[in-house]
Amino acid sequence: MAKEAARVRRRERKNIASGVAHVNSSFNNTTITITDAQGNTIAWSSAGTMGFKGSRKSTPYAAQVAAEDVSKKAQEHGMRTLEVEVAGPGSGRESALRALQAAGFTVTSIRDVTTIPHNGCRPRKRRRV
């Protein structure tokens, strides 16, 4: 009886025409989350979940593959238009944005929402290579 209740529910297909793509590109990874207008997550992907490990996660190609994966998931829900919010200093920002546009989404706006400290925490030490 309890085993029947523990079964995983299938995600129901929502019909959402427009949403917001949050592209977070750090120095180590790129995550892309597509939400509806209220902020409820519809689909997400990252370079790490696409099988890239280590320093390959931070490449523009890994961000492009993650964007193609998340766009496929979002189009199953009927999404066609996106607002894009880009955050972070990483190298996968532009390639993820280009991959979302190439997947067939009409991008209505692009915003940079990277947080900038007003002299907050002390930064990391300089790398000497």
Curated annotation (Swiss-Prot):
It comes from the Bacteria. One of its GO terms (biological process) is translation. InterPro entries: Ribosomal_uS11, Ribosomal_uS11_bac-type, Ribosomal_uS11_sf. Keywords: Ribonucleoprotein, Ribosomal protein, RNA-binding, rRNA-binding. One of its GO terms (molecular function) is structural constituent of ribosome. The keyword Ribosomal protein applies. One of its GO terms (cellular component) is ribonucleoprotein complex. The keyword Zinc-finger does not apply. HAMAP family: Ribosomal_uS11. Part of the 30S ribosomal subunit. Interacts with proteins S7 and S18. Binds to IF-3. PANTHER family: 40S RIBOSOMAL PROTEIN S14/30S RIBOSOMAL PROTEIN S11 (PTHR11759). Belongs to the universal ribosomal protein uS11 family. Located on the platform of the 30S subunit, it bridges several disparate RNA helices of the 16S rRNA. Forms part of the Shine-Dalgarno cleft in the 70S ribosome. This is Small ribosomal subunit protein uS11. It comes from Bradyrhizobium sp. (strain ORS 278). The lineage of its organism: Bacteria, Pseudomonadati, Pseudomonadota, Alphaproteobacteria, Hyphomicrobiales.
